[in-house]
């Protein structure tokens, strides 16, 4: 049972998160509502609004955009190399956006921050988005990208035995699903970094009830729309690789879950952490009070984002206990 809250929407946010929410609201106010324009135009607006968040941050010794072949056509990757040291460990990173929005451009700052802080080459995946490319295209591209990274590690100064998978929101869903496919094929990423991910289509949880609405950056109706575009209508039979909270999780590598408390998806992460532990998977559960969905993108002005990136990067380096 969900008890009524005596806290007004947004009052439980940290001050820097309120600033983040105001900034986003002001930026979107200069454009038509996304649901009033075509999807291509909505994507352009979302890219323009998010573009300032991707600016600044650490410089890389090298950034390279490449195209690789996959069963679904050419796939773009962005490779951020933080230093000239040989044989970096690596992180294949899948951006969020409900499988529908955003890109490696909107998440460029987050990826460079992780590269610099964790000492890993970070490879962003420009996967095909829904509804033009529905499930399982993006997941299959994620698997293909990880296999390409392992096969071409030496030429890009990476350690082929230390290539992690990660992502945020819908990208965390894809990262976890890709790890399950690789596990079943006898392959293994060396770690999983999952930032405020969506792992199930059940929106009856307490966090959906408590944090639904614009004050918290993501809502129930928005997530339902994302699921419909990703899976199609009518919904196909349940596939645990689309909703990996329902999958068998044993045999996965160590996993870090970054969880903002004020997020409709919070309970997805808490349930996943419990199931991973039951399956014997080492889990680091990093909870961030007062933070909202997508909070890591606010790194240019947010103490919560600084803490989130610092903690998860320390975990990737092996400096933090599970």
Short names for language-model regions:
Residues 105-124:
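Short amphipathic alpha-helix adjacent to the substrate-entry channel of hydrolases
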Residues 234-289:
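Serine-hydrolase catalytic core
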Residues 150-165:
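Gly/Ser-rich "nucleophile elbow"/oxyanion-hole loop immediately N-terminal to the catalytic nucleophile
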Residues 87-97:
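Short beta-strand element of the alpha/beta-hydrolase
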Residues 300-322:
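Catalytic active-site module of serine/aspartate enzymes centered on a nucleophile-bearing elbow/loop
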Residues 133-154:
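Alpha/beta-hydrolase active-site loop
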Residues 1-79, 321-322:
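A glycine/proline-hinged amphipathic helix-loop "lid/cap" segment
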Residues 180-235:
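Hydrolase active-site cap/lid region
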């Amino acid at each position: 049972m969900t008890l009524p809250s005596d806290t007004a929407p947004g009052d439980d946010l940290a001050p820097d998160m309120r600033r983040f929410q105001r900034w986003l609201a002001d930026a979107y106010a200069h454009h038509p509502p996304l649901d009033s324009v075509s999807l291509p135009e909505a994507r352009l607006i979302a890219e323009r609004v998010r573009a300032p968040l991707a600016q600044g941050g650490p410089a890389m010794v090298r950034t390279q955009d490449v195209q690789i072949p996959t069963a679904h056509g050419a796939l773009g990757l962005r490779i951020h190399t933080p230093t000239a040291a040989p044989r970096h460990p690596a992180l294949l990173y899948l951006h969020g956006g409900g499988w529908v929005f955003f890109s490696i451009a909107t998440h460029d700052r987050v990826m460079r921050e992780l590269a610099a802080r964790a000492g890993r080459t970070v490879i962003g995946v420009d996967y095909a988005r829904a509804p033009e490319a529905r499930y399982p295209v993006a997941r299959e591209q994620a698997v293909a990208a990880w296999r390409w990274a392992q096969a071409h590690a030496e030429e890009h100064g990476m350690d082929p035995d230390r290539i992690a998978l990660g992502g945020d929101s819908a990208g965390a869903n894809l990262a976890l699903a890709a790890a399950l496919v690789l596990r079943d094929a006898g392959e293994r990423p060396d770690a999983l970094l999952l930032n405020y991910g969506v792992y199930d289509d059940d929106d009856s949880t307490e966090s959906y009830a408590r944090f639904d609405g614009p004050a918290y950056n993501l809502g129930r109706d928005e997530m339902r729309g994302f699921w419909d575009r990703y899976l199609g209508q009518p919904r196909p039979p349940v596939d645990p690789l689309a909703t990996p909270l329902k999958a068998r999780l044993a045999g996965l590598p160590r996993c870090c879950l970054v969880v903002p408390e004020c997020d409709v998806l919070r309970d997805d992460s808490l349930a996943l952490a419990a199931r991973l532990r039951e399956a014997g998977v080492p889990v680091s559960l990093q909870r961030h009070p007062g933070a909202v969905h997508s909070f890591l993108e606010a790194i240019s002005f947010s103490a919560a984002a600084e803490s989130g990136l610092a903690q998860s990067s320390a975990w990737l380096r092996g400096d933090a206990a599970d």
